[in-house]
A protein has these predicted regions:
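RNA pseudouridine synthases
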Residues: 93, 109-112
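Short beta-strand-centered segment that lines the nucleotide-binding/catalytic pocket of NTP-utilizing
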Residues: 30-41
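Short, amphipathic alpha-helical "lid/cap" segments that border enzyme active or binding sites
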Residues: 87, 183-191
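Small-molecule kinase domains that catalyze NTP-dependent phosphoryl transfer to phosphate-bearing small molecules
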Residues: 59-66, 139-184
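Pre-Walker A (Motif I) flank of P-loop NTPase domains
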Residues: 2-11, 97
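ATP-dependent small-molecule kinase phosphotransfer cores
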Residues: 41-98
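Conserved phosphate-donor/acceptor-positioning beta-strand/loop module used by diverse small-molecule
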Residues: 112-135, 140-150
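Glycine-rich phosphate-binding P-loop
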Residues: 8-21
């Protein structure tokens, strides 16, 4: 079956967001990333600002804090409500049109569909650090901290909500090293696979 949905999970600083955006442009299909925050907020009943800060990165304080977090009458934590709203939005987008979806555990959420290409973009630390320095105008030490912290939070979120291991090749159709292949080649490989 032809793939009509492309999910891109990525390490921070690997250029996965840029690669996904370029693939969507070249294919003439929709691109979803932070632009789905308002939809998630509406479905969860939370503010867009809260969702923006927490959607992909929660449960940020670890399992102990999660166990004692505030819950609604159904027993769901705020993080669970955000995740459930995110899941619904991603399922709706996949039904609506061909698209590229960045992050948000979309590969797992859409795992039962045959028309999805799941991609994981990673890179070599030195190149990722230099990209973070350029994009965020930070010192090297801050770039390293950002890379480690954000990837750790993505991993915790993914592992918690999917019961799978973030970045493990078995969970994706393609795993591409953007440092070794370059962005253009990553884009071409993805487009060749759909």
């Amino acid at each position: 079956m032809k793939k009509r949905i492309i999910t891109i999970s990525r390490e921070f600083g690997s250029g996965g967001r840029f690669i996904g955006e370029e693939v969507a442009k070249k294919l003439g299909i929709a691109y979803y990333d932070k632009n789905i925050i308002n939809d998630i907020a509406e479905k969860s009943g939370l503010s867009p600002e809260y969702v923006q800060k927490n959607a992909e990165l929660s449960p940020k304080k670890g399992l102990f804090a999660y166990a004692f977090a505030g819950r609604d009458i159904t027993g769901k934590s705020v993080e669970d409500m955000v995740y459930e709203a995110q899941r619904k939005v991603i399922l709706e987008l996949a039904e609506k049109e061909p698209c590229v979806i960045i992050g948000r555990n979309a590969d797992y959420i859409l795992k039962d569909r045959d028309d999805v290409l799941n991609v994981f973009i990673h890179g070599d630390a030195p190149e990722k650090i230099q990209r973070i320095i350029r994009l965020y105008n930070v010192e090297e030490q801050k770039a390293v901290k950002m890379m480690v912290d954000i990837d750790k939070r993505r991993m915790v979120n993914y592992n918690f909500y999917t019961n799978q291991k973030w970045g493990k090749a078995d969970n994706y159709t393609l795993c591409l090293n953007s440092s070794q292949l370059g962005y253009d080649r990553c884009e071409k490989i993805i487009m060749e696979c759909i």
